[in-house]
Regions:
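Cytoplasmic-side transmembrane-helix entry/capping segments in multi-pass membrane proteins
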Residues: 55-62, 125-134, 259-263
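Alpha-helical transmembrane segments of polytopic membrane proteins
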Residues: 26-38, 92-110, 132, 143, ...
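C-terminal transmembrane-bundle signature of multipass membrane proteins
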Residues: 39-44, 234-366
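Generic multipass alpha-helical transmembrane bundles of integral membrane proteins
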Residues: 123-252
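Hydrophobic alpha-helical transmembrane segments and adjacent interfacial helices
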Residues: 63-83, 110-116, 133-150, 209-225, ...
Length: 367
């Protein structure tokens, strides 16, 4: 075994099959360091955005305005055949409908949540309290559509997305798509949304750790299924950042944390996709680029559209089934408790007897 490559060692191959990501070998230190750097960066930028009005306006006002002009210029120039635009990394790797839809849906959420937090304009109106539910549901449906798209385009076979990523469809997409739809109805207390007493957060008291966990499992499964070359960052670091904040120091503010960090990450990834990209020929621009174990041999080389060679859907199936099961359990609990208490879970609240709910409600200005 002396001098053998990591991929040549039998126990290393077995370990690969039992892991979610290919995070071992020569690049492991870069992969873990980059993921932790993204995690810390998202937490810090979220704190800047939520704690200061100026920070929020810059991050979710000025920066997106500049980037929107940039995206339009790139798209128009690329269509005209201008060389710099045709070869621009945003145009090459992030030109699919999903990434733009996710970015601007998240941005819409951030702006709407700030309106509620600071009581700007319609943010003071009672009917607008249902906006957080609506925008989160839209974001979830965007991902659900992407899951079903993958199942349709490659039923237990490889297909190449418009961003040049090899995806493998199947029942895992169906399971997780259904889980996403159920997850929408796991959101309760739609109109019980408030500004925090310190004006740093929008508080949704009934969105406690129960929803946070089932959402995170579902969304992780989505990124694992449909963003396999990005999931190490957008399925691990991006989900951990708002959850850590909401469980430790920002109780009740998870959904605002989530929107903020999602929008920040989407803007960064749209401009610098090469940061995390693994190309369809198996090469990477940076050593920390990480892929999932759906690529059986740890590479994406030699994959052919319409075939199943080099595919390992086991982990995708397990995490997608887990997402479906936990969302069924959560929704069942909500229904049973609502029937028992004779209360509508959407116009009323469900988790009022939980400590997390009480801690969140104590932070809110309830009018």
């Amino acid at each position: 075994m002396l001098g053998a490559k990591a991929s040549d060692i039998p126990w290393n191959n077995d370990r690969r099959k039992n892991m979610l990501f290919n995070v071992y070998g020569d690049n492991a230190i870069y992969q873990w360091a980059a993921m932790l750097l993204v995690l810390v960066g998202l937490i810090l930028l979220n704190e800047v955005a939520r704690r200061t009005k100026v920070g929020g306006l810059i991050i979710f006002g000025a920066v997106p305005a500049v980037l929107t002009v940039y995206f339009i210029v790139v798209a128009v120039a690329a269509r005209m055949g201008v060389e710099w635009a045709v070869n621009n990394q945003t145009h090459i790797y992030m030109n699919g409908w999903f990434h733009y839809a996710k970015l601007y849906a998240a941005l819409t959420g951030c702006i709407g949540f700030m309106m509620i937090k600071y009581e700007w304009g319609i943010g003071k109106k009672h009917w607008f309290k249902a906006f957080p539910f609506a925008i989160v549901a839209i974001n979830i449906l965007i991902a659900v559509a992407s899951d079903f798209e993958s199942a349709i385009n490659g039923w237990y076979s490889w297909w190449l997305s418009s961003e040049g990523v090899w995806l493998y469809g199947g029942w895992h997409n169906v399971f997780n798509g259904i889980a996403g739809i159920l997850n929408i109805f796991c959101m309760t207390g739609w109109w019980a949304v408030y500004s925090s007493k310190d004006k740093k957060d929008m508080i949704w008291p009934d969105m406690i750790w129960v929803y946070i966990i089932v959402y995170d499992i579902w969304n992780f499964a989505y990124t694992y299924n449909c963003l396999p070359t990005h999931s190490w960052f957008c399925g691990v670091a991006l989900l951990l950042a708002p959850t850590i904040a909401a469980l430790i120091w920002n109780k009740g503010g998870w959904i605002m944390n989530r929107a903020n960090t999602l929008c920040i990450w989407c803007m960064f990834a749209q401009v610098f996709p090469l940061f995390q990209e693994t190309f369809h020929d198996g090469t990477t621009f940076y050593p920390w680029a990480t892929i999932t174990t759906q690529y059986a041999d740890g590479t994406v080389s030699g994959i052919v559209a319409g075939t199943s060679a080099n595919a390992n859907p086991t982990a995708m199936t397990i995490v997608s089934l887990m997402a479906l099961i936990v969302n069924i359990i959560a929704l069942t609990y909500i229904i049973v408790k609502s029937v028992k208490n004779k209360k509508n879970p959407y116009t009323g609240e469900v988790f009022t007897n939980f400590k997390y709910y009480q801690a969140a409600k104590d932070r809110a200005v309830v009018k």
